[in-house]
Amino acid sequence: AYCARRTLFDKDKDVKEINAETGREFIVDRSGWHLILLAKNKKGYQNLCKLVSQSWIDGFYDRPRIDKNILEKYHEGLIVCSACLGGEIPQKIMAKKIAEADEAIKWFKNLFGEDFYIEIQRHQTDKPASDTQVFERQQQIIPTLLSLAEKNNVKVIATNDVHFVEEEHAEAHDRLICLSTGRKLAEENRMHYTKQEWLKTPEEMFQIFKDIPQALENTQEIVDKV
């Protein structure tokens, strides 16, 4: 999902103030954050459908968006995960706003209880024409994510920011990014992914997160809920 920082109905301010940023993934205002929503039962699926509809009908501004007011209204039956570096909590940690990150965790924990999880990701890469800085930022925020998760009694899950299925699909994905952003493949100063965003096997994920085994174990808990 993409979750807007302000109410969706405050669109005049959006036009003046917002800069573009780059499961079903929603956006909660263009200046907002990524958020992962999963339906764990029929009610959750119905609410997910309502959120999708509202994001297109009432929340569309450059892209479909929801806000926390709508999320609060249709939260029943949903599992929520904090998302990648584009999520609210990682963004606030990277901005050194730790108290605000803690406040955001408390908000989600209060609404979703044990159905809220904090994600950690690692996309170390040596592939050509890839973003090598993502892994550095991920590593920098993981200690704080683990600390805040423990403080708020929220479980941590190890995830991969999946954008394609197989490892060999990375080059095709890179070309699709160029098409969607209107840039040439040879341009250096364009959007790059890490080329690690494929659907990794349990064995691959274990090798990446074997130092944080509980984060791997907790992913199975989500499977058992659905």
Give the predicted meaning of each segment.
Residues 1-226:
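Phosphodiester-processing cores and adjacent nucleic acid-binding clamps
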